[in-house]
Amino acid sequence: AGIAHIKETKENKDFYYKVNRDLAYETARKAKGEAVRQFIFLSSMSVYGIENGVIDKNTPLNPNTAYGKSKLEAEELIKKLEDESFIIAIIRPPMVYGKGCRGNYPRLAGLALKTPIFPKVDNKRSMIYIDNLAEFVKQLIDNQSGGLFFPQNAEYVNTSEMVKVIAEAHGKKVVMTKLFNPLINLMKRNNTVNKLFGDLVYEEGLINNNQHNGFINFEESINLTEN
């Protein structure tokens, strides 16, 4: 149970809490009452409330949107249900991409197919391909694991490289140039520009051993998404 990618307004703020917090908690409570052994809650990187930088074990939880706040409150409620007979696994994935996914990926894909020139920016972002996320959840179930998890692809993603690979998946070529970089740096106060070209990663120390077993590599994940 959850909602995302809906523009937040004063009118729909309560809806985020009803679905992402209340419904998620009631689902977990029902599962425990039915003697389910493990409950996996899909939370979000949004619980940190930051748009730039490196997230590590000391990064404070400070969500600044109804989405992030509702996810964090759900985590806190669901965690209270945990005991020896009810395992709780909380996942905080970064941006998820794949066929049919919403968010920033479709914007980048659209740019990759329309523009012959794109900024060459040396940024890094944690992302995860939807099938890799599914594989990660499968591993949690197979191992009956509990705790807090930060799944991501085996490599950080560079925005310029992603656009290049998307274009190549369609037989197109995009020329990368640093000519636009000064303008991009000035525009990073814009939330959309910052999400595309800023840095936002999970520190590698948060990644669990053997997490990437069975994961699809970045280039193949783009080809599967685009074709």
Describe the function of each predicted region.
Residues 48, 89-107:
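Flexible, glycine-rich beta-alpha linker
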Residues 136-192, 216-218, 222-226:
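Mid/C-terminal beta-alpha module of Rossmann-like enzyme folds, strongest
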Residues 1-30, 48, 52:
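NAD(P)H-binding glycine-rich loop region in Rossmannoid oxidoreductase-like domains
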Residues 110-128, 132, 139, 150:
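A conserved pocket-lining segment of Rossmann-fold NAD(P)-dependent short-chain dehydrogenase/reductase
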Residues 25-66:
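Conserved Rossmann-fold NAD(P)-dependent oxidoreductase catalytic core, especially the SDR/UDP-sugar
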Residues 62-89:
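Active-site Tyr-X1-5-Lys
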Residues 1, 39-45, 91-93:
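SDR active-site strand-loop-helix element
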Residues 15-26, 61, 65, 69-72, ...:
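Glycine-rich NAD(P)-binding loop of the Rossmann-fold in SDR/ketoreductase-type enzymes
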